Regions:
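Generic transmembrane alpha-helix signature in multi-pass membrane proteins
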Residues: 27-29, 55-64, 158-161, 172-174, ...
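Hydrophobic, aromatic-rich membrane-embedded alpha-helical segments
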Residues: 160-171, 175, 302-328
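Interfacial segments of multi-pass membrane proteins
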Residues: 27-41, 171-187
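Membrane-interface alpha-helices
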Residues: 193, 197, 319-347
Length: 358
């Protein structure tokens, strides 16, 4: 057992619990880039650890009633066989060094998708897809399951998880958000965690059959991750993680580009551009999606802040303002909106007709 991997598992577990991000996108690159674990062993060990950890989070959501079991069944119908197929593809990509490199490149591409999904999730939230009235646990909304599409989503996620261990978190949640906007975020997260249990279990069995599993790594991840996930979930209900999400998306992008073979200098330049431009753009889009009345109620100048974010980007002022927006302004604006039931700004007005086509 490696205590350094235990500590890494603890940190990753905290981030998973606080943000709802997928563990594979976080832990697997750490094993490869920091601990020198081969990609195939990193994927196998992380998936088996996830299979051990998922039931803890799933049990919490099931007791809270935030799981749509109908969706779980149809997602599992696609994800379980696809996860097995992903494992087979993993070992059909080649042998020796060629296989390891192919798995690493596939993982880098999947993590970029996960980072993009995390950004999309926050932008969908800011666009009014999740209102204050949908934030609570509450009973699961009555929906008609779109069976074929749901099975397809499960198959897509299962295939990615089987190959790379990435995809059970942010990617699946964003896909479900677009298909089932009636479900609250907690219900989406709960449904995703429970459906991931059979999917990850199938992938874990497949990897154990093919070899590559390092029990010491799996045990170290689980030892640090299980209590940390529970602690992170507890902390997330008592504090803001608005700034944590863009930081996490940034780190995921950097690790993905490194896995894809980008050199240190090119990586530093690329990530500097991403930070200096991406964060202000994100803040501007998110800020414009917040109702002006909520800005006023929070005592924050909307027009001036958005002007600094946009016009100040070329000289770095936009980046600083965007960081302040996500860290301090946005939580205050969201709180003001929820307390005063402020209607959302155009084009998503509260009370406006929302399509419920399923």
């Amino acid at each position: 057992m490696s205590w350094s991997i235990v500590i890494a598992g603890l940190i990753v577990g905290l981030l998973i619990g606080m943000t709802g991000a997928g563990g594979g996108a976080l832990m697997t690159p750490i094993l490869i880039l920091l601990f020198g674990v081969t990609p195939s062993s990193a994927v196998s060990s992380d998936i088996v650890a996830a299979a051990i950890m998922k039931p803890f989070g799933g049990a919490v959501h099931y007791r809270r009633g935030t799981v749509h079991m109908g969706l779980v069944a149809w997602l599992a119908l696609g994800s379980v066989p696809a996860a097995f197929c992903g494992v087979f593809i993993d070992h059909a990509l080649g042998s020796g060094e060629a296989m390891q490199q192919n798995i690493q490149y596939a993982m880098g591409a999947a993590i970029i998708l996960a980072a993009a999904a995390m950004v999309a999730r926050m932008l969908l939230d800011s666009a009014g897809r999740r209102t204050a009235s949908q934030a609570g646990d509450g009973p699961v909304a009555e929906i008609r399951v779109r069976r074929l599409l749901t099975v397809g989503i499960g198959a897509f996620g299962g295939l990615l998880v089987g190959i790379t261990s990435v995809g059970a978190g942010s990617l699946m949640i964003v896909l479900l958000m677009t298909v089932y906007p009636q479900l609250s975020m907690r219900q989406l997260v709960g449904t995703d965690i429970v459906q991931a249990m059979p999917m990850v279990g199938a992938a874990a069995i497949g990897h154990a059959m093919f070899g590559g599993l390092v029990f010491a790594i799996t045990a170290s991840i689980a030892l640090g991750g299980i209590p940390a996930v529970l602690l992170g979930a507890w902390l997330s209900s008592r504090g803001s993680n608005f700034l944590l999400r863009p930081i996490l998306a940034f780190v995921l992008t950097a690790s993905a580009l490194k896995l894809l073979g980008l050199g240190a200098t090119d990586l530093a330049i690329t990530m500097a551009i991403v930070a200096l431009v991406g964060l202000p753009v994100w803040a501007f889009i998110d800020g414009r999606g917040r109702p002006a009345a909520a800005w006023d109620a929070a005592g924050i100048a909307r027009r001036r802040t958005l002007a600094l974010v946009s016009a100040g980007t070329p000289v770095g002022v936009g980046f600083i303002t965007a960081a302040l927006y996500f860290g301090r302004m946005r939580p205050a604006i969201v709180q003001a909106a929820s307390q005063d039931a402020v209607p959302a700004s155009e084009p998503f007005r509260a009370g406006s007709p929302v399509s419920t086509r399923v």
